[in-house]
Every structure is written in structure tokens, then in C-alpha cells.
Regions:
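A conserved helix-loop-strand patch within extracytoplasmic ligand-binding domains
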Residues: 119-168, 270
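Ligand-binding "clamshell"
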Residues: 107-119, 134, 206, 211, ...
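Bacterial lipoprotein signal-peptidase II cleavage site
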Residues: 16-31
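A bilobed periplasmic-binding-protein/Venus flytrap-type ligand-binding module shared by bacterial periplasmic
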Residues: 126-137, 241-254
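Short helix-initiation/N-cap motifs at beta->coil->alpha
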Residues: 76-87, 175-202
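Periplasmic-binding protein-like
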Residues: 154-163, 264-284
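Alpha-to-beta junction loops
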Residues: 90-100, 144, 167, 188-191, ...
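Short, well-ordered beta-strand elements
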Residues: 42-54, 72-78, 145-146
């Protein structure tokens, strides 16, 4: 029995020493946090801009990448008239709009009580006189008809172009406020038809000629080179009627406004205008 006990004690002691002799377990390594190649991109800020279909919406779409690089996701809302883009901006449904020139904007603010401001010139679209039933201005007959835009500032612009071509003469000192009532001389007794701007191209089959806004001429597939006459690029009209980026008063210095203006006045925008429109749209910056 004593011998058995001794053997057991010997085994226990041997096991104890073996356990003590085992190396301490190495501390568990803490896994390093996984890293990605680059930080997740910041979420783009949505910016909503109202525009005429051509060329404004097309120009905006051409600079989407410029805005994306600046942190903005551009949404272009297309309009086919000259009223809704301003009322939508006034009501806060848009962040900006791009379709009009300053005289039209000022006239709209005065008549509608809106609070919209221009923040920069983008481009100029020369008005053109396009052939309808008559293919030459000198051939327009006595009592012939010419269609012009029916909104205030664009009507004046059309009348100034007709005057520059010797078809009518306006009253003394009447320029950008001219209406058909300000025609002082009309040698051929022409019938001047006031038509909604968007419908002018469609009216060509019914009149001898029409004075058409640049964007609607482009939209109708009319080429500047085919116009019977256009505004001179160095004329006061070219400067006065440059199309502008517009925001609601108080938002002129918003970061989104600055980013929009920078994109629309970029080399990308200018190159797009030159290549796409072949003289029908001219950068104004």
C-alpha cells in the first residue's frame, strides 16, 4: 500500500512540474481594424435648377460632372414656358433657374412681385429673322406679316432687330421698352403679329417671316446661318440680353449658387456651346 501511495504521489508531482514548465500562452493578438482603400465619399448635396429645354438644360447637363466634383448632385427640371420657372423658384421649389435675360427678369419681378436676382451671365443667343412664306427680307410684300414674341422685353428686342433691317422705325429714344404701339414708321404697312415665343417657329408657314428667340430656333432645328438677319454680336443687345443664372433674393452667396455659377462659366461649358450650337449660342463670360 505504501508503495502504491508513493507511486501516486510521484506521478502527481511530475504532472505538477510539467504544468509549471509549460510556456505562458502568448497574449492574443488584437486584429487591426480593416482599412479601405479610400474614405467613403461624402454624400452629394442635391441642387435643383429649372431651365428651358434648349439650350439651357443641355448646357446644365454638360456640366454635371463639374458639379459632382464640387459635391453637388444636379437635377435639371425642364420647362417649356417663361413663367413657371420663375414662379417655381419664388415658391422655393427650385434652387435656381437658367433660361432668361436680365430685362425679362426685372420686368417679371416688377409685374409679379417676385424677389429673384441674377448672379452671373452665362450665354447670349442672337435673335434671328427666319423665313416663312418669303425667303428674302426685301421681297416681303406690301401688307406682309411678321411674327414676333408677345412678352415685353423680347417684343422690344424683336422690334429693334426689325428696325435695324429697315423694315420699321420706332419712336425717338424708344429701345428696350418698345411695343408695337411705338412703331413710328411702317413703310410696307406690315402686320406685326404678337405670338407666344414658344409658338413662333410653328407660325412660319402662316407669316412671311418671324423673329425667333435663339433657344426656340435651336429647338425647332433652325440654323443661325440660315436666318435672313441676326443681331450683331457686338450690339448692345448681345450684352443686355445675355442669359443669366437666377436665384431667390438672399441666396446669392450660397455655396451651391457659387458652385453652379462656376460650372456654368467653366471652360467645359464654353467648349460645349461652341461645338454644339455653331454660333447659335455664344458664351457671355
Amino acid at each position: 500500500m505504501k508503495k502504491l501511495i508513493a507511486i501516486v504521489l510521484t506521478l502527481v508531482l511530475a504532472l505538477s512540474f510539467a504544468a509549471c514548465a509549460q510556456p505562458e500562452a502568448a497574449p492574443a493578438e488584437t486584429a487591426a481594424p480593416e482599412t479601405t482603400e479610400s474614405a467613403a465619399p461624402a454624400e452629394l448635396v442635391k441642387v435643383k435648377v429649372g431651365a428651358s429645354v434648349t439650350p439651357h438644360a443641355e448646357i446644365l447637363n454638360a456640366v454635371k460632372d463639374e458639379l459632382k466634383a464640387a459635391g453637388y448632385d444636379l437635377e435639371v427640371v425642364e420647362f417649356t414656358d417663361y413663367v413657371l420657372p420663375n414662379t417655381a423658384l419664388e415658391q422655393g421649389d427650385l434652387d435656381a433657374n437658367y433660361f432668361q435675360h436680365t430685362p425679362y427678369l426685372e420686368n417679371f419681378n416688377e409685374k409679379k412681385g417676385t424677389h429673384l436676382v441674377a448672379v452671373g451671365k452665362i450665354h447670349y443667343e442672337p435673335f434671328g429673322i427666319y423665313a416663312g412664306k418669303t425667303s428674302d427680307l426685301s421681297a416681303i410684300p406690301e401688307g406682309g406679316s411678321i411674327a414676333i414674341p408677345n412678352d415685353g422685353t423680347n417684343e422690344a428686342r424683336a422690334l429693334l432687330l426689325l428696325e435695324a433691317q429697315g423694315l420699321i422705325k420706332l419712336k425717338e429714344d424708344i429701345t428696350f421698352t418698345a411695343t408695337v404701339l411705338d412703331i413710328a414708321e411702317n413703310p410696307k404697312n406690315l402686320s406685326i403679329k404678337e405670338i407666344e415665343a414658344a409658338q413662333l417657329a410653328r407660325s412660319l408657314q402662316d407669316v412671311d417671316a418671324a423673329v425667333i428667340n435663339g433657344n426656340y430656333a435651336i429647338q425647332a432645328g433652325l440654323k443661325v446661318k440660315d436666318a435672313l438677319a441676326i443681331e450683331d454680336k457686338d450690339s448692345i443687345a448681345a450684352d443686355t440680353y445675355a442669359n443669366v443664372l437666377v436665384v431667390k433674393e438672399g441666396h446669392e452667396n450660397d455655396e451651391a449658387t457659387k458652385a453652379l455659377l462656376a460650372a456654368l462659366q467653366s471652360d467645359t461649358a464654353k467648349k460645349f456651346m461652341e461645338e454644339k450650337y455653331e454660333g447659335a449660342v455664344i458664351a457671355a463670360f
